């Protein structure tokens, strides 16, 4: 009877170690200033979505009697999917960062409409990391440097 219980405990222990979680941490900076960071623990192969946005309302059209109001979504959206393979951790991820640069107003007939101008950063790729390794992805455009940093650790 004791042997049976030890076999059951050993089976559960093996299952628990096979289902170890992976801790993923990300950070996005622009010219050295932190724009956003995200951290999660998840199981092997499980996608974790990420969303840190604000809605900015703006006048998008209409007529004199009725103005059409729309929402501009600014901030960060994305997801991470870690996979373990031997001693490595493969992480598939995407990130989309949008910021409002300015919102000029223009007269259109008898109404005023807003014209949001945005900028941002977009990255989608898969990276192979060793346990605990940190990787940086740099992008330089028009004097603006974005750095996206990602790391993954088996728990």
Describe these PLM feature segments.
Residues 18-155:
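Outer membrane pore-forming secretion/assembly proteins and partners of Gram-negative envelopes
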Residues 1-4:
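Positively charged n-region of N-terminal signal peptides that target proteins for export
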